[in-house]
Regions:
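Bacterial N-terminal signal peptides that target proteins for export
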Residues: 1-11
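Bacterial N-terminal signal peptides
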Residues: 10-20
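Cell-envelope and extracellular/periplasmic
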Residues: 26-553
Length: 553
């Protein structure tokens, strides 16, 4: 006779198996319409984006056109709301690019089931007030959104369309930073918000995808402690709610503004990449996230051979925010960089760990959205000249500032990169040794933070922070003469910051350090925008870094 405990375990096992089978059956259903809700404030609306700009970003070509197979219902805006007349085909609304456009294309490429998007968003709204489900104030977004969603779903019912609500993509929190009470209680308010949606939509298993507030914006600098507080609140929810996921966005593009170039909105490129992030987060939950394995054909070095390891590090342009492989195809004499080079082992962690290599891969394009960094042209140039083996390890976070790389970090502790960076370098060295190579760390090639050059307090402290990073890295890596090659593009030219001669300050640090090489990247191809380099600029930067190293041999 079975004991009760044995019977209980057997019952639990059957329950789990039934649950797995049930979930698999749900995902295998390719006929039920999957409805996604997009909600939030201005960076969910798509503020400061333009449909005409889509053509500037080749991976997203065509997203200005209607997606006829995707249903769309929307209510967007504050005082003057733009509403769809029932369900329509998904397309930009009033020349604005929202994340739903790239989300839909990415999802429909991965699944056969039809999808629909309901979007309710308004700039300048806060969770503590407008979106408060219990006591909404201001624009009373929660009851408005609930009514709009119910109305859209009722229309599907009237058409006898079989559907299910698949998830909610939520991007909001910037305005809660400006209210001390809302900021302090953001996590608590968000938890309540999710619970009320599940209750009011009668979907207890409703998934939420919570978008990070992008630290690449000006608010990620001048409001650093406040933005950090919101992120802590978001993570407090996503870390305990198994149906809520935290979606990083700090590596996406950000609009280039006037004056010093900084902005608080994602703009066209950022919105397109923003949507892909939500799509990948969703596809991850159903086991359909796209992958592109890039294994080495064979280990490129013989046992005992000497290998020079080059570490590339930095922010927006070292990551390659606006350098696209499609642009590389059009550059004369550069198309060979598109091919994987199996003679150079390449390891990377980009976007603050948003994407990492599967061990060592061949040198080749491996960015987030068909992007690449200076590593391609750098690796090609160095590899042609050196007799020893060449390996490249790249560690970047385009949403970081120099302070995040310093040993002491900042009050926004979750943004501190220094420990992860040093660990990444150590692991790269050790892995090569474990494979039987004699390894030399040939140098760290760091491209100075672009955003830092556009905000006075960070521009003013750039040289001291750089020196702290360099000095401590040599101590922690046990290499007192470790070469640092620090490249600097022309610093932001604007009256707000021109009183700080950051170039002279970096020169002073370099002149006192025989192993710090200051590379003035002042002759790169002319750029259309401040701060960011395009495809030609990133290629030229890699070649300049290689030239600087090779000239010192």
């Amino acid at each position: 006779m079975m004991h009760r405990s044995t019977l209980r375990l057997a019952f639990l096992a059957l329950t789990v198996l039934w649950g797995v089978h049930s979930a698999a059956a749900v995902q295998a259903d390719d006929t039920t319409l999957r409805v996604f809700i997009f909600a939030g404030q201005s960076n969910m609306v798509g503020s400061d984006s333009k449909v005409a700009d889509i053509q500037r970003f080749p991976p997203f070509a065509g997203l200005g056109e209607p997606q006829e197979d995707v249903l769309f219902s929307y209510c967007i805006g504050r005082e003057n709301k733009h509403r769809s007349e029932g369900w329509v085909s998904l397309a930009p609304v009033r020349n604005v690019v929202g994340p739903e456009l790239s989300f839909a294309r990415e999802v429909t490429r991965a699944i056969k089931a039809p999808i629909a998007v309901i979007k309710v968003a308004a700039g300048g709204t806060h969770l503590g007030g407008d979106w408060n489900p219990d006591e909404p104030i201001g624009f009373e977004m929660y009851p408005l959104a609930l009514d709009w969603i119910r109305s859209a779903l009722a229309a599907l019912d009237a058409q006898e369309t079989k559907y299910r609500i698949e998830g909610v993509c939520w991007h909001q929190g910037e305005n809660d930073m400006f209210n001390e009470d809302y900021m302090a209680s953001y996590g608590e308010n968000l938890s309540r918000f999710l619970a009320c949606w599940r209750r009011d939509l009668q979907t207890p298993d409703l998934r939420f995808y919570i978008g990070e507030l992008c630290t690449k914006t000006i608010w990620g600098m001048d409001l650093r402690p406040r933005m950090h507080a919101i992120s802590v609140g978001q993570r407090a929810v996503t870390e305990v709610d198994p149906l809520a996921g935290y979606v990083p966005t700090s590596h996406v593009g950000v609009e280039i503004g006037g004056g010093v170039g900084l902005h608080y909105h994602y703009g066209t490129l950022g919105q397109l990449e923003h949507g892909v992030n939500y799509a990948h987060a969703y596809l991850e939950t159903i086991g359909k996230r796209p992958t592109q394995p890039r294994p080495l054909k064979a280990w490129p070095y013989k046992a005992g051979d000497k290998v020079k390891l080059f570490v590339l590090a930095g922010h927006r342009n070292m990551e390659g925010e606006r350098a696209f492989v499609q642009g590389l195809k059009a550059m004369r004499g550069k198309s060979s960089l598109l091919k994987d080079n199996h003679r150079i082992a390449y390891r990377y962690s980009i976007g603050g760990g948003y994407k990492t290599s599967d061990g060592w891969e061949p040198m080749g394009p491996a960015g987030f959205y068909d992007t690449f960094g200076p590593e391609l042209s750098f690796g090609a140039a160095v590899g042609r000249k050196l007799r020893e083996g060449v390996a490249v390890a790249k560690f970047t976070h385009s949403g970081s500032q120099i302070i995040d790389w310093t040993p002491e970090g900042s009050v926004a502790a979750t943004r501190n990169l220094y420990p992860s960076f040093i660990r990444f370098v150590e692991e790269s060295l050790q892995d090569l040794r474990d494979r039987g190579q004699e390894v030399e760390l040939a140098g760290i090639f760091y491209h100075l933070g672009e955003n830092d050059m556009s905000w006075g307090p960070f521009r003013n402290g750039a040289s001291d922070r750089l020196q702290a990073l360099v000095n401590q890295s040599r101590v922690d890596l046990g290499l007192p003469e470790l070469p640092w090659f620090v490249s600097q593009q022309p610093p932001t030219d604007d009256e707000q910051v021109n009183g700080i001669d950051v170039t002279a300050e970096i020169e002073e640090v370099a002149s006192a350090d025989p192993h710090l090489i200051h590379i003035k990247a002042f002759d790169l191809p002319e750029q259309a925008k401040k701060l960011v380099l395009d495809t030609a600029g990133v290629v030229a930067l890699g070649e300049l870094l290689a030239k600087s190293f090779l000239s010192r041999r």
